[in-house]
A protein has these predicted regions:
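Phosphate-group recognition and catalysis centered on beta-loop-alpha active-site segments
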Residues: 1-130
């Protein structure tokens, strides 16, 4: 396939900009559903990162530790999704979203870029879960 045909098949929204970790600011925490909705509302593609929780579920967060975005220590791979949902909130008060919640929110409205975050060699389990 020629380069021109490949480019022609790409969604034009991909070229308008990609909101890194959503379209966030001092009132919307990065990688939160409200930051992703803000990107969607502005017709921007967005990028996010996913980690594998202890129970095999996928959580959206850039860092492997929840401290920077929640203010509370916690290694994602050592916690279950239930523990995270019960005990952690993003700095703006929002829940830390799961991969499934991000997919449901976007519902194919804009293109997304997802980075799989490997922790201590868990790449096979992470790839299977994703």
């Amino acid at each position: 396939m020629s380069k021109n045909k490949i480019v022609a098949k790409l969604n034009p929204m991909f070229f308008s900009g990609i909101a890194h970790r959503g379209l966030w600011n001092d009132q919307l925490t990065e990688n939160g559903l409200r930051a992703f909705q803000n990107a969607i509302d502005h017709h921007l593609s967005f990028e996010y990162d996913i980690h594998l929780c202890k129970d095999g579920q996928l959580l959206v967060c850039h860092d492997d530790n929840l401290k920077r975005t929640t203010g509370k220590e916690g290694i994602i791979e050592e916690l279950t999704m239930e523990e995270i949902k019960k005990n952690y909130r993003l700095l703006d008060g929002e829940e830390v979203p799961s991969f499934a919640e991000v997919l449901a929110l976007n519902h194919e409205q804009v293109p997304m870029v997802c980075e799989l975050k490997v922790h201590e060699g868990n790449y096979k389990a992470l790839a299977r879960a994703a």
